[in-house]
Amino acid sequence: MESKRKVEKIMKVVIVGGVAGGASAAARIRRLDETAEILVFERSGFVSYANCGLPYYIGGVIQEQEELTLQTPESFWKRFRIDVRVRHEVTAIDPTAKTVTVHALETGKVSTETYDKLVLSPGAKPIVPGVVQGELERVFTLRTVEDTLRIHDFVQKHKPKTAVLAGGGFIGLEMAENLTELGVQVTIVQRSRQLLAPFDPDMASFVHGQMRSHGVALRMGATVTGLQPDGESVLTLLEEGEPLRADMVLLALGVTPDTKLAKNAGLDLGVGGSIAVNDRMETSAPDIYAVGDAVEVRQFVTGQKTLISLAGPANKQGRIAADNICGGDSRFHGAQASSVLKLFDMTAASTGINEKTAQAEELDYDKIVLFPPAHASYYPGATPLYIKALYEKGTLRLLGAQIVGREGVDKRIDVLATAIRAGMTAAQLKELDLAYAPPYASAKDPVNFIGYLIENLAQGKVRQFHWHDVAALPRDGSVTLLDVRTNAEVSSGRLEGSLHIPVDELRERLGELDPAKPVYVNCQSGLRSYLACRILTQRGFPCAHLSGGYGFYQAVTQEQQRLGSIYPCGIEKA
């Protein structure tokens, strides 16, 4: 046995890039193979860091720079005996010779390393508009720890009073919050008409209202055409309108796969120029694997190839590649882009697909909107969860969900993400046995309510119409618009031309309705309108209720933030 061990060939694994995917692969390989030679090349000065925490170091929430560093070259060697070389850039791959060319950035030395297995984890690079030429002192991108330190040092030294953030995705919004908390007046410039692309425009309206309520200015539908230094400030030039002057500019326009190395090596590329891989994370070249933001993935719900730049999938892919390198057979079954975001005192989260994707894939889907309290409404401090869920009509399978609120958002989105992964239907959602106590939830959890609502629609117990249908409803007397809210609620606004009958008076006042006319019912959140429709339907009235109620309609059409205290639907509080 001893002699056999001596003649066994030691496997040499070279990993290009650390952070999530590369570092995860390296550690997993060591756990599976104590004898393997593992060499990690990282272009930056940090091999494994909390890139999702970078904005919070700039904002002072994370106090110490060291907290961002998950592993160092020294700790990697001490614990895993992994040779990590930072400030080393791999500039070429020869798949035939199984070698990589390495450039030591600090010394300029160029060397060649052989490999038995190669893992590519180059990540993604920030999108910089072509109109931005060269580096400008007060213009930043945020990808690495070095970028973070540069921004942090600038903020500490120059104490900027104004900032323009080009881009309204995750990084842009997190930076907007953190700079605002530092007293910086922030303006977000967004090319599209909404922030947070994974959200549908109606749900994004809550995000818009939240940002504006905290003093963040939004310039929607605006395109950056150039950046121009102007003394101690920078002018952001727009396609339309006057330039925006600010003390600093952050480009957060998204990312694109960093695949130059793979392309030059002749590897097959996929969607958006990403590295094409199979479900074992293998590229088109033998013994070369790829993981992280640079690779294409299968969208779990639709099965289509896409790009998902999130830490969770990158870590999982690193582990899967490591398993297969060490003789296993692990598979990556796709990602559903589950994400969560803190926006001051609000949380926004999503999982699965949105309406834009469902329509592009020509799925036969429907949607529901509900506003349940995050915990029992009688327990102090209850606030609403604004939930939108998409489901497949034929199977009643959950396709996607979006939630905003002050508490309990992350818990519900994780349950729904699990439900999507398990292929759960409405019947299964309503039967989920979830933890309950008044400070945390209601006996019928919001997740259960999603199942109830979908099932009611599928069984024909109620019909619904949506906020975007309201404008097209006839106002010629051929239909009845019925508002069943309380007097106090109606006094603050109502649908034009609507008849007001509180739901508790409806049975006694049915004579005021014409049974020959379709009735379109609204309340504040959708619960009382459902109850009203059940009354009317059983009395022979053709009826539909407004999904999400007047509250959702008003929030979307007026982009008002409505995250105040919530009480059981229809109960007034003095």
Regions found by a protein language model. Give the residues of each.
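A Rossmann-like FAD-binding core segment of flavoenzymes
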Residues: 35-37, 79, 85-106, 113, ...
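FAD-site-proximal beta/loop scaffold in flavoenzymes
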Residues: 135-159, 231-232, 243-320, 415, ...
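Short hydrophobic core segments
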Residues: 16, 113-123, 166, 244-254, ...
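Beta1-alpha1 glycine-rich phosphate/pyrophosphate-binding loop at the start
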Residues: 8-87, 127, 176-199, 338, ...
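Rossmann-like dinucleotide-binding cores of NAD(P)H-dependent redox enzymes
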Residues: 69, 162-163, 170-228, 308-314, ...
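Mid-to-C-terminal Rossmann-like scaffold of FAD/NAD(P)H-dependent oxidoreductases
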Residues: 8-11, 18, 294-406, 438-442, ...
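Glycine-rich dinucleotide-binding loop and its adjacent helix/turn
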Residues: 120-182, 217, 277-279, 501-503, ...
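Rhodanese-like catalytic fold shared by cysteine-dependent sulfurtransferases
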Residues: 427-438, 442-479, 487-520, 524-574
